[in-house]
Amino acid sequence: MESLKKEVYEANMDLVRLNLVLFTWGNVSGIDRDQGLVVIKPSGVAYSDLSPIDLPVLDLETGAVVEGSYRPSSDTPTHLALYRAFPELGGITHTHSVYATSFAQAGRDLKAYGTTHADHFAGDIPCTRMMTPEEIGGEYEAETANVIIETFRERNLSPAEIAAVLVHSHGPFTWGKNAAKSVENAAVLETVAQMAFQCELLEAAVPLGGTRIQQELLEKHFFRKHGANAYYGQN
């Protein structure tokens, strides 16, 4: 568990290094599926004050804190529910990075405009529906996960191929095989959101934004890096 704590700590520090967060915003978690335990950033603690020992450890099924003296992130129920729903997830990141959050606040899917997007995501990044007053007034953080899960299931999307979502009026969640990969995907998401924003400014005369990348080009760039026949890199 100490190695997972260190991994999740370093991933949280990467949020600061990559300028994805301000103040105490954002959080990263990681999971040990063999033990059914999750490590996550504590709630409201400044990144500069964090050390690996400060990160609480929770039971995946019950949400009970099994190790640590700090309260876990207020977004913990969202993380836990996503881990339960999507067994391929090994780490989750939540930020309020500016451009990705702008699309979330506008209630807009992030359209795949080019190959930078396609290198990392196999399609548009979905934005969830608005949450109902009952969902907001109930178990809000768990219901946040529910609208994410609903979005992927209703649209028949693979969380392994599209490792990100925009929560309407809120912000982005990203994930990956581990905590570090979930942060990498958060950084990529923010970059392609900025590219998309600027692309739409340049094509402002086109209704609903610019021209989406050709599907064939999107699939070529995604699957040359991912999947059984990937040939990008040294592995």
Where are the model-predicted features located?
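Glycine-rich flexible loops
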Residues: 1-235
